[in-house]
From Swiss-Prot:
Bilayer topology annotation: Single-pass membrane protein
Designated name of the protein: Short chain dehydrogenase/reductase dpchH
Residues the record marks as active site: 275 (proton acceptor)
Source organism per UniProt: Colletotrichum higginsianum (strain IMI 349063)
Glycosylation, residue list: 16, 242, 386
EC numbers: 1.1.1.-
GO biological process, alphabetically ordered: terpenoid biosynthetic process
Amino acid sequence: MWTGQPASGPPFDHENHSASCTQHFALFSSPSPANSEPKSMLSAWAHRLCVRAVDVLFGTFLYVPLGILFLKKSLSGFGDGDWDSSQIPDLHGKVAVVTGGNAGIGYHTVRQLAAKGAKVYLAARSESRAKEAIKRLREENPDIPQEKLVWLPLDLSSQAQVVDAARDLMSKTERLDILVNNAGVDPYNYVKTADGFEMTMAVNHIGHWTLTYCLLPLLKATAAQQGSDVRVITLSSSGERNHSANNHFTTLKDLDDPCAGPGWEDSRLAQGKRYGTSKLANILFATELQRRMDEEGAGILSLSLNPGTIRTEGAADVMPLVTQPLVWLLFTDAAKGADTTMFAATAREVRENSEQWKGRYLDGPGRIKPPSPKARDAVAARNLWNITAAAVKGTGALEKL
């Protein structure tokens, strides 16, 4: 999974560098009456060149140290090494939902849950990809009964469709034991959804907030049953440390932070900042959800986690060409990357010692690690919940519940 943070050494001041580039090329942007069009063309060309230069520098300063760091971590082990998928308990009778379950970590999460007996709703936008994933799962795991794998249509970028997915699920099952908020988009250009939300924040955070909110009655009803073990697991990333330093989640505009000045919204720097901010939101969401569940005495566990630096096509796409081989040489495969999710969702010790684990951030199976200081800010967590609720209610989608 993309990290968005230099692994070592002094930080590269991208924002000041970007500003200096803008000032430098501003010399070309004040046209005279005689030759305004050529200078305007030159200014646009110079701006694109400057953005590209910053992107190359950003990739060099970020991904090479990242590869070295991950190699060291791979040699020393990820997590504390005493838990693996062989310790997943029997899950017969349980029902799970995994968003983005058709590929990557989500695919292997679905596989392991179903292999242990759970009925799994594979939540994904594309019907063809979801059904192809289910077909492949059954071919690779013939012992999984067909009825254990069900496609749940879900487009996290659309509030109306998220609510539809929740209603669809609640019409099909009377319990929900495990909700894995796994789906997400990698660093992305600055575009808006039909609801008016910035795409990265919409998919990675807002859509999952709405899905969880809509499913809370079902989760609580399951948690009220004797012997239940209900968990909500939200995938974040070490990239959360690359969040926007100026975003404190105090206004609705903070959900639409471009993380760059005009003309720079699609630079790798801005894309990375938006991604990091959305991953910060994942941790704050999980923390605040736990606080609210404790306040209500609901008995639901909420955890967030960093699955590690995972080898995916998306991870390669966000890197400069020169550093893309690092993905295939040093990153963890998605099957192994699902171990942290499975620990959080199923490990017996998490329920048996719930006070130790609930609301925490995991950095490997069985490994609690403090996230960034802002991700531990309880006030920011409450603020984020409140502005997200206001933004979602403003779309009118919740009226369909």
